[in-house]
Amino acid sequence: MTEPETTCKGFEVNHLVKQYANADKPVLDDISFKVEHGSVLVVLGPSGSGKSTLLRTIAGLEPIQGGTISINDQVIDAGKPGTERAGRSDRSSELRTRIGMVFQSYDLFPNKTVLGNITMAPVLVQKRDKSEVEAEAIRLLGRVGLADRKDSWPHELSGGQRQRVAICRALILHPEVLLLDEITAALDPEMVREVLDVVLELAKSGQTMLIVTHEMQFARAIADHIILLDLSLIHISEPTRH
């Protein structure tokens, strides 16, 4: 019996070029790779190799000057020469929410509670029902071990707790692809373990993820595939997640 073809084919970058104004050469030049649906791709590389820039262009926070970014064979961004000085891509808000991103710096709103931080975007941007969004937010907080902190303020949380809230804030938008940029870089070993446990659970649940990290142990624990970004993308290995 033939298996039915899935409608979720993955995420793909083809011949991506990113260059900043007045730069002698692109920071990303002819970059191509694919992340299969439900898998985890980890990007390693030295400082200044363009890892964070790669994630920012994929998230639509910066325009690309060449190539394409696609989800499930649908192009969501295409390179436009002459956009080196532009602040963001011209991707629509609907397309933006198909990709979620969590930064190293958390970026939580200090004047909103944990619950308020998580529910703001789906209510204001996606126009979803507030009560339903709040119920989902509470469920997400339970998944990351923070069900009792929904009314807390960001300054009352540890770094690991704030990072878990940031992950919930991205997940509640139902992204098809989740980008994680050095999310353990500023955390102590105990907090790294807290965040790694959450990411491992996401991987087991089938969340497609693209992760930038400098920690090889973290990479090997979570990755289906690892690539190195330096002057080019080099396939390293296909570790067994454990």
Regions found by a protein language model. Give the residues of each.
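The feature captures the beta-strand-to-loop junction immediately N-terminal to the Walker
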Residues: 44-46
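Helix-to-loop junction immediately C-terminal to a conserved catalytic motif
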Residues: 59
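ABC ATPase NBD coupling module
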Residues: 76-100, 130
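Conserved ABC ATPase signature
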Residues: 153-157, 161
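A short, proline-enriched helix->beta-strand linker immediately N-terminal to the Walker B motif
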Residues: 172-176
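Catalytic Walker B motif of ABC-type/P-loop ATPase nucleotide-binding domains
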Residues: 178-181
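H-loop/switch region of ABC-family ATPase nucleotide-binding domains
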Residues: 213-214
